[in-house]
Amino acid sequence: MPTIRPDEISTIIKQQIEQYNQEMQVSNVGTVLQVGDGIARIYGLDKVMASELLEFEDGTTGIALNLEEDNIGAVLIGSGRNIQEGSTVKSTGKIASIPVGEALLGRVVDPLCNPLDGKGPIQCTESRLIESPAPGIVDRRSVYEPLQTGITAIDALIPIGRGQRELIIGDRQTGKTTVAVDTILNQKGQDVICIYVAIGQKQSTIAQVVGILTERGAMDYSIVVAAGADSPAPLQWLAPYCGATIAEYFMYQGKHTLVVYDDLSKQAVAYRQMSLLLRRPPGREAYPGDVFYLHSRLLERAAKLSSQLGEGSMTALPIVETQANDVSAYIPTNVISITDGQIFLESDLFNAGIRPAINVGISVSRVGSAAQTKAMKKVAGSIKVELAQYRDLEAFAQFASDLDEATQKQLARGQRLQELLKQPQYSPLSLDQQVAIIYAGTRGYLDDIPVEKVSSFKQGLLAYLGTTHPKYGEIVLSTKQLTDEAEEILKTAITEFKQSFVAKAA
């Protein structure tokens, strides 16, 4: 056994005294009173903030939502299966934030930006708060640039501008997600970063969307935030805010972003579940009193920034699902009142083969017309009126047997315009193609073409224009206008193609 000399003992004691750290670590600790259904009631944690992150003994994270007199109601982000009554909880002193950066492009992540695509960790240097204040009045400017969706019916009749919030609303299986995905596909080469937020969707549906985006090369400029149907309610509630936070990072760098929230009905249901479990008083349709604020604070973050802030933009396309075309339910009316217009999709039109199934009569864009390109404005000015008149006459014509010639002409024109606006999914059209087909329809070139041949005429005309008259496309795409020269080329092309088309049909 080694012996220690007395002088060594004094040296050891001196070293121990020198190494002694007087700093005290103060942590705010509480105790779990009750846990279950993704909710925990905690005693203690006197100095906790609203929406502060909490750390449970088993490593689960929670968010403090209810700060009551004698306890705290927290929601669990995770299963929380190992949390027991009496477990300790620490407050972290942090509000929920996520890592953001260019590294997210092309990735599929959960609402906390953890990768779900098996492509390894995401290296981000910056982080942003999930709940950020929306830009103020001085920080914004009015919407003036178009966001081309590639869907002729929308770009001609319900145009969307960069920085706008346009609601896509309709029953299940009416093509809401298809409209949003088509819009993302059409942003290729437009320098727009797209974020698709899937809330409460089936995993197979999310995989299908990711598959289409990957196949078409759209994942190069897209990010998918997924909180599937099997995700805990708090993650489904946070997912849209996470998508907005990622978009804000790019927006404040002067870039243009597009965010699709698919869909906000499921986010409201997740929030209702959490609120009822936290014993918050229920209101209409059992939703809590602040469900309007839930969506307004999210959608107000979409903006077109002023020139001082770099002129970036965030365009929001929220999706809301209705039951039996009831637009007057609680969540649909809330979101309609917050957004700058809505695209209403109808199951009757969808089943009748009119796809995209847009009801032109009640769909509206409140600010998009200011952003519509001059070329589109020139050719599409009369199409909305003509379609609306056609719908009225169509209902009338079912009961009247003998119609005057003018009415018959109007009905024939309306049928052809309706046929012209049909478009298969995942095949967006460029601006010059849209202008060409609408010009052909509104200027009467299709009036003597049989309705069933309008679709093949449209396809043939676009192919003919691209091969024999490429200058037309160059002029329209570079100037965004239908100049006199472009119009002459277009007239010549339509006349030439129509002659050959009619000759072949005969």
Swiss-Prot record:
Binding positions (ATP): G170, D171, R172, Q173, T174, G175, K176, T177
GO cellular component, one term: proton-transporting ATP synthase complex
Catalytic reactions on record: ATP + H2O + 4 H(+)(in) = ADP + phosphate + 5 H(+)(out)
Membrane topology: Peripheral membrane protein
This enzyme's EC code(s): 7.1.2.2
Site, as annotated: Required for activity: S363
Pfam family, one: ATP-synt_ab_C
PROSITE patterns to which the protein is assigned, alphabetical: ATPASE_ALPHA_BETA
Subunit structure, interactors included: F-type ATPases have 2 components, CF(1) - the catalytic core - and CF(0) - the membrane proton channel. CF(1) has five subunits: alpha(3), beta(3), gamma(1), delta(1), epsilon(1). CF(0) has four main subunits: a(1), b(1), b'(1) and c(9-12).
HAMAP family xrefs: ATP_synth_alpha_bact
NCBIfam families attached to this UniProt entry: atpA, PRK13343.1
Protein name, per record: ATP synthase subunit alpha
Species for this entry: Synechococcus sp. (strain JA-2-3B'a(2-13)) (Cyanobacteria bacterium Yellowstone B-Prime)
